Amino acid sequence: MSLKIRLARAGAKKRPYYHIVIADSRSPRDGRFIEKVGAYNPMLPSDHADRVRLVNERITHWLSQGALPTDRVARFLGNAGLAPKPAYTEQPKKSAPKKRAQERAAAAAAAAA
C-alpha cells in the first residue's frame, strides 16, 4: 500500500477548503483516508496564521513510515520545516523567434516607419 500525504477538497462551490490527509494513493481524491493531519484554506490571505495548519507529530510519524507528500503538500512541509524544501524549478524561457520571423518583423517595422 503506497501512502500519500495529500489534499482532499472540502467546502462549497467556489469556496475551496482542503484537508491534509494520509491516504492510499489508489483511493479517490475526496474518498477514504487513514488520518487527517491538517488543513489548508486558500481563501485566507497568504500571511494569515490559519491558512495552513499542520499536526507536526503525526506528519513526522507518517513520513517515517514512508508516506510521500504530493507537490503542494511538500511545499507546505518545507515551509514548516518538517521536510526539506522541494527544489525550485525555473520556468522555461520562451524561445526567440526564428530567423525568418525576425526578418518579417524587421520588414514590418521598416514599412510602418
From Swiss-Prot:
PROSITE patterns: RIBOSOMAL_S16. One of its GO terms (cellular component) is cytoplasm. This is Small ribosomal subunit protein bS16. One of its GO terms (molecular function) is structural constituent of ribosome. Pfam families: Ribosomal_S16. The keyword Ribonucleoprotein applies. The lineage of its organism: Bacteria, Pseudomonadati, Pseudomonadota, Alphaproteobacteria, Acetobacterales. It comes from Gluconacetobacter diazotrophicus (strain ATCC 49037 / DSM 5601 / CCUG 37298 / CIP 103539 / LMG 7603 / PAl5). Residues 84-113 are annotated as: Disordered.
